[in-house]
Amino acid sequence: MISMIDRIKKYFKNNWVPWLITVVAVITVSLFQWVGAFDTLELKMYDYRFNTVRGPLTGWMASDSTYIKKGTDVVLVEVDDEAWRLVPEEWPYPRGGIWAKAIRNLYKAGAKVIVFDIQFDSPENRSEIYKDLIQTTTTDYILNQVPSLRDSTQAEYIQNSLPKLIPRHGDDMLGEAVAEAQMFGTTVIMPAKMVTEPTSVPPQYIAYPVRQIMNANPELGLINDQMDLDGFSRRYSLFDVMAHEPDKYYLTLGVKAFKAFEDIPDTAKPYFDSENLIWSYGNHKIKAYGQGNSFLVNYYGPPSGYKVRDERNLPAWSTFPKYSLAYIIDTEDVTLRDPMEDLDWMTQFLPGEIPEWIMAIEDDSERVEMMEAMGITEGNDISNSPFNNKIVVIGTSVEVHHDYKQTPYYNFSGIQQLTPGMETHANAIQTMLDKNYINVLGGGLTEFFNEFNKYPFSHILLITLLSFVALLILLFVNPIIAGFLILVTCLVYFAIGCGLFIGDIFWGIKSFAPSLFESKLPEIGESYIIPIVPPLVSVGVTYIGIVLYDFIMEQQDKKYLKNTFGAYISPDLILSLIHISEPTRPERIS
């Protein structure tokens, strides 16, 4: 027993420096991770899992049909290039003629929730001009402008007729459409924004929609973004608070849509379990990212409407069902700019209505055949509507509006592609509805150096484990072989880290021969994230530190032997003496 203890003491006496180097490497790398030195690289590795390892969950590029068969609860209605070309009005579109029409058509088509990602926080300009014209036009002004009028009675008649000749205020019409939709059971959610102005008192306030919309009592949701340090959108806030009202939660747009769709009562309030990093909202559990009020969005795919511009003529990615605003307003009373595309498309989804051009088909059999091809029945059952019992997110994707975000799919398929801001809400909503949250070891990956996130002990253990694996390899084999084995260890760890995201730790092996293995998407809630960069850096620091130490000590040994025996022994014999003790880690010559 004593001899064993002596051997252990002797071992550590001769090898304490490599162990010390390893401990220092663990501490140093952990400190660097804590202050955020690896955050940018770690975030890029996070994105790599989405755009390369897993790919989309929905759309035609999905590796299997698990999520496609299930379908999504979110439908997009976009001001896209098609709407820009076909809508018979210039931007900004009239609130009464376009947006009110869209709301009415969607609620009639069965939409359960209508979410606007377009702000209406200032009065409609064209309606204000008409309003000002009515208010400032006097009988004297009319008499002066129309010399043929001689009688003030005629001028008064014209003055009284002006309000009937000029279109109604667009804000009034939009507010009425919101109220009408909600009366028929469709929840309308309007965006609000938390604004900070240092010169105002208090410095923070909420920019609400205009009075007419507020009078319709819509749901309101914040649209303030939460960006990572590299400007990408990966997280989504549940709520925000103002400094002077820290106990009042203002829910975000996506959470309000989730609340309306799941019928969560107004009395429910998010509560945080700091031990398990879980937000409880109603009967639902939301996995928080760190100690903050946000969660990681499990993006379902790249931008739905993006098409690769090359000779392959591939279809759009189609992550979510997407429809142009032009077709949502396209009924008999709206004429699109291009008559060839004016098919009254939306009429087929409205109860009891059949497009006029179909009714104009004289041959009964042809008319029935066309109705069957279009999915139209005599009663026009809304169960065939793509909007029935769906959350419809309305926003803009046209390039001139610059409402785009960088997401984990920014480099999908090797092509840089921005995601419309409205789709960040859609992905967040679908993540909550499916409970498809991302599990992160320790609760977070980045930004530990702030008051909200605690540095997880599990990360230190992971860094320590890989560093000591590198140490043990170096203790038993020479640096060249050790370097190869450590490289293999790093590749295995990288493959496992990526594989955990798709629920398959053998992803690394399968990726070398994808045609031989069936590719499957992870089940709901089965995506796991572990830190990749800090553990790999710790391995590199450990290896370099120990090899550098060995090199320095070897040079000192050579110098000592040369100075001591150089006059008596040949140089070749001196070099061979350095490696006499053992072939892998020589005892130091004292």
Q: Each PLM stretch: what is its role?
A:
Residues 150-172, 362-386, 521-526:
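Intrinsically disordered, low-complexity acidic Ser/Thr-rich regulatory segments
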Residues 316-378:
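Long, low-complexity, polar/charged, intrinsically disordered or flexibly structured peripheral segments
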Residues 413-419, 548-552, 581:
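Short, contiguous acidic/charged loop-to-helix segments that flank catalytic cores in large enzymes
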Residues 2-292, 296, 300-302, 387-479:
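Non-transmembrane functional regions of envelope-associated proteins
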Residues 434, 438, 444-548:
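Transmembrane alpha-helical segments that form the functional core of multipass membrane systems
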Residues 537-574:
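Juxtamembrane or sensor-core-proximal signal-transducing alpha helices
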Residues 52, 56-65, 557, 567-577:
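Membrane-interface segments at or immediately adjacent to transmembrane helices
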Residues 578-589:
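Single conserved hydrophobic/aromatic residue that forms the stacking wall/gate
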